[in-house]
């Protein structure tokens, strides 16, 4: 369902595009913007849904072209009635006044376009260098309505609906071919153009030609041209001219129709009164803010380059003999004045300068109040005191705050922190704005630690966040206090006083009576309504007693229950013995009997019977009797002699040298004896003990203490001193397994033993 919103405070320079941009993210159908205009800047906007209208209302107080606008809920009936009243007021008015001004409604615009399109034969040429466009019929050849006079009564015409930044040259181009003698622009109380002007022509003939330009375009706006009067010209600052002078000038200077008046301007310009005057004395004033403290008059003259500016037209403001960031500048011409306003937010010495128009009356009033404050009581100059509209230098002069608009109505402080993710913001530095009913406005105030951070944060202006285009504006603390927010007063002392008052129960002092009707999401505001309920502590006495009694009895009940649970642990203490004994009897002993003994019987003995005896029988005996037993012959067996391989060749080491023992000498047998026959005293005693072959096998299969025992047995069986010495070294060194393996392989010449030993490992 379509909903109509009424907008007030729309500046004259703003158009439908600016309104649609202000409501970015909301659905406005085609033809949904109706600008009424007038002194109050009225307009009606149609939104597609109720949700869009509700979110649009929350943006009330925002800025369109640096002008604050107010939004109200309206209806189609009110919109139609307002449009009809404005149209009737314009038609029934005999002569224009300085009162309300307006822009034609949509129905009037369509009617005018149709009427002018049907009279396309009256067109005339237009100066193409002007840069403006007409509606296809020309400026001076429109067929006038029956209700409008075709001939001017005097050389004065009243214009309505002019753009904000219009100047005299634009008006002369608008009346191309006519001799314009002077222009006076009407202004608001703040010094801005209100869209109205009075034009004085050289003659009534030129004024009659100007009436034909009614509802022609100046840029993108329709301009209403009506009959004026000499009284209005004088009232708004013009000088009266004698009638004879007017007739003489009209005869001399009125050019033929269609001829450009450029070569007449100098002569007519010299005889006309001053072309721009305001209600106040001569001059146009601007208010400069956020200036650098080191700036001087020369810097401002360079800043306003191209304007006629002297040091006498510049005035800086001081506080306690210290310069502030404010200044006033007076311009002599409207052109210089418009040039200065176009430099708004231009950076000067690393600071964006804010240039606002101001009237002479307001400037003098501000200076008088400021001078009074300087010479006034020290109470007004104490820290924290701010004037009603402007705050002087100090901390309030620095622009540390940013006013944020166009957030969703339910935005939170955490979301604001995410928007300023590049800046370290605490929740205390963020202030959310709410209406009287506690509904979010989608606006917030954020304070930064320094001006540099605030200026960097302002670069996020018009960045999309949460589906909307967020608008940012850098403001000072004084401007922030106009919202009713003062971060400087929210100090730790005040927070401590609030906490102490809350502990005392004096909840009436938690919030200052001077606090504005703006709600925050702070910690105190969340409990604002609950504090009143907490005052009635009598309602909570009985529940507290009921809860305290059960807290005392349960420990006694559990003390008795703990005694009952002491006996089960005694019963369970015997269980570890039951579990430990089976571990020793059932697991440890069977592991020795079942695993270790079969390992010796099944694995160690069978290889001795099945593998080693066949090797000796099958491989060594067929070699031609080279291998002998341990009782005689050449020591080709384990007891000594040159060890032969399976092929009968003499084995060599990896390097190609003769195989040597560990001690570095010639290769010896296990007993360490040199290569010779075992006879006489060198014959080993093997009676009543294990043979040397069995001891060698056990030596290969054991390590550590068992190996030392085997070496002791070999020492007992060895008679030679050198052999005993070698075995003693082996026993002391605890031979490496690989060394013993290499020694046994060279002595026994068995290759399969490597696989067997590897499997055992």
From Swiss-Prot:
Glycyl lysine isopeptide (Lys-Gly) (interchain with G-Cter in SUMO2) crosslink site(s): 114, 151, 335, 514, 541
Pfam entry (one): RRM_1
Record field: compositional bias (Basic and acidic residues): 247-262, 372-384, 538-621
Gene3D superfamilies linked: 3.30.70.330
The keyword Acetylation is annotated on this UniProt entry: yes
Residue numbers bearing the Phosphoserine modification: 98, 101, 112, 250, 254, 278, 280, 292, 294, 377, 575, 591
InterPro entries for the chain: ESRP, Nucleotide-bd_a/b_plait_sf, RBD_domain_sf, RBM12B_RRM2, RBM12B_RRM3, RRM4_RBM12B, RRM_dom
Domain of life, per lineage: Eukaryota
GO molecular function term, any single one: RNA binding
Ranges of biased composition (kind: Basic residues): 263-278
SUPFAM superfamilies found in the cross-reference section: RNA-binding domain, RBD (SSF54928)
Region (Disordered): 120-147, 247-278, 372-392, 538-690
Domain (RRM): residue spans on this chain: 155-230, 284-360, 400-477
Keywords for this protein: Acetylation, Isopeptide bond, Phosphoprotein, Repeat, RNA-binding, Ubl conjugation
N6-acetyllysine modification, residue list: 319
Residue stretches of biased makeup (Polar residues): 627-654
Biased composition (Low complexity): 661-672
Modified residues (Phosphothreonine): 276
PANTHER family cross-referenced by the UniProt entry: HETEROGENEOUS NUCLEAR RIBONUCLEOPROTEIN-RELATED (PTHR13976)
Protein name: RNA-binding protein 12B
Organism: Pongo abelii
